[in-house]
Amino acid sequence: MAKIPVLEIFGPTIQGEGRVIGRKTMFVRTAGCDYRCSWCDSSFTWDGSMKDEIQMMTAEEIYDRLYEIGGDCFNHVTISGGNPALIKGIQDLVDLFEEKNIESALETQGSRFQPWMRQINDLTISPKPPSSGMKPNIQILDEVIEQCVKETLNLKVVVFDDDDYEFAKYIHHRYPDLPFYLQVGNPYLDDEVENHTARLLERYENLVDKVMQTNDMNQVYVLPQLHTLLWSNMKGV
């Protein structure tokens, strides 16, 4: 059985982003990413700062750890990163979740497709906007989206500034039939941030106001990062 590089397993908690925001879930955070986003809130998955914490685990070992800390208080697991779509071996984990009647969620930037992504119940593709410093390959994004199951797929773009908002409009209009979520960016990544919740809510209100004043984003959902409103930048929640 293939082994998966794991940095964190935690929960139960709530999903803080996207279509399943508020959903009770467990988290499995994998190591490794093919992007280097300037504002990444989980850069420890790829910058080497926690390389000594990586555990190579089989699907069975991951499930056993989930059950050890979550007991029977969950039936949904979010696979996070980094970019889990780099890891072919997650196939074993997704198969095991299906066997155990556990629903799964995944977020990826859409730079890589894996066949097991077709088995994910809540699949979020989140192309990275200009503020990230990354430039998505739109042709590859088209190919990845084409191979996914449309009924389980949604798109999300994080917005920090006007350029990001224009990018979000471009993505939404390129794939108009897919559910689309705008998420306000969190530029305050220190462990302790004064008035963090109030500052994030102000940014969220500004994004909401922007969407309300245009007629070409009538079908979008505008969301905050719910977990940052509750717990700021705390890890493991």
Where are these regions (language model features)?
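Flexible, acidic/Gly-rich N-terminal and inter-domain linker regions that tether
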Residues: 1-31, 35-43, 214-215, 221
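Conserved beta-strand segments that form the floor/walls of ligand-binding pockets within enzyme
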Residues: 5, 27-29, 41, 78, ...
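Conserved Radical SAM active-site core
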Residues: 7-8, 24, 36-121
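A short, flexible beta-alpha/helix-coil linker loop
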Residues: 12, 45-47, 187-189
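Short, mixed-charge, low-aromatic patches
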Residues: 17-23, 48, 121-125, 159
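Short linear functional motifs in flexible/disordered or boundary regions
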Residues: 18, 40, 49-52, 167, ...
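Conserved residues at beta->alpha junctions
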Residues: 31, 81, 159
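Conserved AdoMet/S-adenosylmethionine-binding subsite of the radical SAM
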Residues: 73-75, 85-237
